[in-house]
A protein has these predicted regions:
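Structural alpha/beta core scaffold segments of enzyme domains
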Residues: 1-182
Length: 182
C-alpha cells in the first residue's frame, strides 16, 4: 500500500491540550491491518467509554521524599524520587517527567536538592501530554512536603511556605539570579 493510497478522515479532533499526537496510533494500526487483509476500506471509531479506557490521560506520579529542615521550617535539603506511570508506550512521558522534575521547587528556594525520576512501563493505557504537562505533579511533591513539615513542627503551613519562598537575592540552580520576587 502506497502512502498516497491512504486517506484518513477525522470527524473531529477535540479541543484543549494533549493526546492528539500519538493516541490515534492504535486505531490507525488496527485499520491498516484490516484494510490490508480485506483489501477494502476500513472504518473504526471508539465509543466514548472505550476511548476513556484506551487512550491515555495525565501521568499519575508517586513522589517519595526525605526532607531536612530546621525548627523554623526552613528546608535545608530535600531528596525527591518520582515514579511516573507511563503506560504501555513512551509517548510523551520523557518530557512530562522532566518537566515535573523542573517544577519540583515550585516557588521555594531549595538549596540542596536531589531529584530522581523513574519512568515506569506498565500494562495500562499509554499516558500522554495533558494540561500542565508534568508541572502540577512536580509542584504537588514540594507542597506535600511543606504540609508535613508544618504539621511536624505544629506551625501554620503559610509560615513554612513564606520562609522558603524564593527571594530576589537567590541564585537558581542554573546560575541565574532570581529577580522577579517581592
Amino acid at each position: 500500500l502506497k502512502m498516497h493510497e491512504v486517506r484518513v478522515e477525522v470527524r473531529r479532533m477535540g479541543g484543549a491540550f494533549g493526546g492528539k499526537e500519538s493516541q490515534g496510533n492504535a486505531l490507525a494500526i488496527a485499520c491498516a491491518i484490516a484494510a490490508k487483509a480485506t483489501k477494502k476500506t476500513c472504518k473504526m471509531r471508539y465509543d466514548r467509554d472505550d476511548d476513556i479506557i484506551i487512550t491515555g490521560k495525565r501521568h499519575d506520579f508517586r513522589i517519595d521524599y526525605d526532607v531536612g529542615f530546621n525548627e523554623d521550617g526552613k528546608i535545608l535539603g530535600i531528596k525527591f524520587k518520582h515514579y511516573v506511570r507511563c503506560g504501555w508506550s513512551q509517548d510523551l512521558s520523557l518530557p512530562v517527567a522532566d518537566r515535573a522534575m523542573l517544577h519540583s521547587d515550585n516557588a521555594y528556594n531549595l538549596e540542596d536538592v536531589s531529584i530522581t525520576s523513574h519512568r515506569l512501563k506498565t500494562n495500562t493505557q499509554s499516558n500522554t501530554a495533558f494540561r500542565g504537562f508534568g508541572g502540577p505533579q512536580g509542584i504537588i511533591g514540594i507542597e506535600r512536603a511543606i504540609d508535613h513539615i508544618a504539621s511536624h513542627l505544629n506551625l501554620d503551613p503559610i509560615e513554612v511556605r513564606t520562609i522558603n519562598f524564593y527571594r530576589s537575592s537567590n541564585i537558581l540552580s542554573e546560575g541565574f539570579k532570581y529577580v522577579f520576587c517581592n
